[in-house]
């Protein structure tokens, strides 16, 4: 008998992943916070709020009961925003059976503690559960995966058996999964690419051109690499799907929420106004603060992240931030 799978979070990505698994004939239950959304998905087989236009698999079950979604499950996919992950895990802890595989598909750094999601998991859950933690990350817009456009991602875990299990479950003709053991690197790549996407969006909103965006992506990758190495990551990870791959997609794609927020900032809108218009979470807004604080604490030079933080939280004019980046003291490219 196959694994029973719960997916926690019915936003665009959670719904897409649940549907991918259910289309393979797997036993999948999708949890949504909103009872009315659960009722709608049961009645129409469509998540019109977060994934309109995609028909959901006939075998996919829906619930707003965490117990129903999590109790007795062999695999639990976590797709809640990173800033509420601790709260969600705390509620899930008494429901989880020993040996369950946890798959984190959220990207961020906890603001209060500056922990990555695997660190939050280790702090909240007993070792028997936290040890089978896997991160699923890479360049993957939900809408394109839902439309079965070819996509490649990474499943990273210190437990190679867990990574292989996640690879097997999620692999589909249009969804290729590679394994990796560098959890820290994959988590940092997924979190920081959203911050650099804000910078790329600001640049686009200011009309600064392709040269500027390319410079931000490349130097943003250097910042990702520096912080990752300081935290014990393998630098090679950042040349892969969870690093450069996700960074390029999020900094250039029109479906990128973080790039969209940045563009509107560059065009002169206020952050509160932008966020008030959004239905889904742009993780980079909170991650900009947590990443900048983490870099400061660890003594890591991250000037782009610093300027994004200042534009978001200190009302620094976007053009001034760009000028300050361009007039920093000259230095060697590496180092």
Swiss-Prot record:
Compartments reported by the entry: Cytoplasm
Biochemical pathway: Membrane lipid metabolism; glycerophospholipid metabolism
Origin organism lineage: Bacteria, Pseudomonadati, Thermodesulfobacteriota, Desulfuromonadia, Geobacterales
Job description of the protein: Catalyzes the reduction of the glycolytic intermediate dihydroxyacetone phosphate (DHAP) to sn-glycerol 3-phosphate (G3P), the key precursor for phospholipid synthesis.
Annotated keywords: Cytoplasm, Lipid biosynthesis, Lipid metabolism, NAD, NADP, Nucleotide-binding, Oxidoreductase, Phospholipid biosynthesis, Phospholipid metabolism
Protein name per its UniProtKB record: Glycerol-3-phosphate dehydrogenase [NAD(P)+]
Root EC class: oxidoreductase
List of residues binding sn-glycerol 3-phosphate: 107, 138, 140, 193, 246, 256-258
Subcellular location, principal: cytoplasm
């Amino acid at each position: 008998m196959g694994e029973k799978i719960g997916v926690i979070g019915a936003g665009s990505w959670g719904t897409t992943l649940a549907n991918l698994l259910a289309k393979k004939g797997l036993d999948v239950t999708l949890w949504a916070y909103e009872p009315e959304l659960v009722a709608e998905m049961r009645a129409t087989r469509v998540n019109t709020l977060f994934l309109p236009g995609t028909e959901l698999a006939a075998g996919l079950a829906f619930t707003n009961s965490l117990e129903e979604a999590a109790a007795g499950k062999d695999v639990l996919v976590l797709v809640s925003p990173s800033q509420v992950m601790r709260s969600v895990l705390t509620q899930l802890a008494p429901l989880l059976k020993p040996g369950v595989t946890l798959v984190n598909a959220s990207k961020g750094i906890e603001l209060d503690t500056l922990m990555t999601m695997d660190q939050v998991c280790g702090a909240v859950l007993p070792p028997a559960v936290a040890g089978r933690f896997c991160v699923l990350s890479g360049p993957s817009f939900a809408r394109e995966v839902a439309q079965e456009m070819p996509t490649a991602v990474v499943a990273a875990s210190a437990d190679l058996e867990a990574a292989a299990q996640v690879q097997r479950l999620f692999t589909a003709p249009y969804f290729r999964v590679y394994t990796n053991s560098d959890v820290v690197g994959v988590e940092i790549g997924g979190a920081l690419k959203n911050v650099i996407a804000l910078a790329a969006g600001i640049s686009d909103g200011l009309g600064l051109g392709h040269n500027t965006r390319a410079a931000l992506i490349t130097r943003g990758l250097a910042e990702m690499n520096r912080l990752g190495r300081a935290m014990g990551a393998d630098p090679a990870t950042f040349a892969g799907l969870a690093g450069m791959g996700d960074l390029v997609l999020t900094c250039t794609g029109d479906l990128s929420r973080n790039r969209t927020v940045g563009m509107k900032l560059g065009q002169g809108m206020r952050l509160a106004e932008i966020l008030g218009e959004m239905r889904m979470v742009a993780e980079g807004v909170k991650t900009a603060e947590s990443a900048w604080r983490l870099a400061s604490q660890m003594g890591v030079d991250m000037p782009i992240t610093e300027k994004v933080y200042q534009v978001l939280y200190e009302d620094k004019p976007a053009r001034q931030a760009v000028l300050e980046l361009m007039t920093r003291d000259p230095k060697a490219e590496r180092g």
